[in-house]
Amino acid sequence: MFLGEYRHTIDEKGRMIVPAKFREHLGTPFVITRGLDNCLFVYPQSEWDKLESQLKELPFTKKDARAFTRFFFSGASECELDKQGRMNVPQPLREYAKLEKECVVIGVSNRMEVWSKTLWEDYVSQSEDSFADIAENLIDFDL
């Protein structure tokens, strides 16, 4: 399971150190793709396979299904860690997520997310006040 928040940097070649606690969960290969909210989603191959199966079931006759699967799959890239525990973030994905030097890597249960430091800080500050309301609307059990 992916848990926690980590601050990292991306070098000029687009390489980023993956938190040590996440490396064993990622395995090799793994998949990185465009996520929602201008972040990147990173999935272990087993989780990607499950997600792919679910998305393949969407009716291609529906415009939204076609748009989402195009967005999601066209940005996907299979990756492996190098010997230093780094992954290479492809340039188009760095541009999509507005990744420059500083980034934030967060664990979200079955996936890892990579955020621009600025976008993450903005997201957290905007979401803090509404977190209780979101929980009330979505969760039917005590936290």
Swiss-Prot record:
Keyword Transmembrane helix attributed: no
Pfam family, one: MraZ
Major localization class: cytoplasm
Gene Ontology molecular function: any one: DNA-binding transcription factor activity
Subcellular location per the Swiss-Prot or TrEMBL entry: Cytoplasm, Nucleoid
Keywords: Cytoplasm, DNA-binding, Repeat, Transcription, Transcription regulation
GO cellular component: cytoplasm; nucleoid
CDD domains named among the record's database cross-references: MraZ_C, MraZ_N
UniProt feature coiled coil, ranges: none
SpoVT-AbrB domain location: 5-47, 76-119
SUPFAM superfamilies, alphabetized: AbrB/MazE/MraZ-like
Keyword Cytoplasm: yes
GO BP term (any one): negative regulation of DNA-templated transcription initiation
Similarity section: Belongs to the MraZ family.
Subunit field text: Forms oligomers.
Protein name in UniProt: Transcriptional regulator MraZ
Organism annotation: Shouchella clausii (strain KSM-K16) (Alkalihalobacillus clausii)
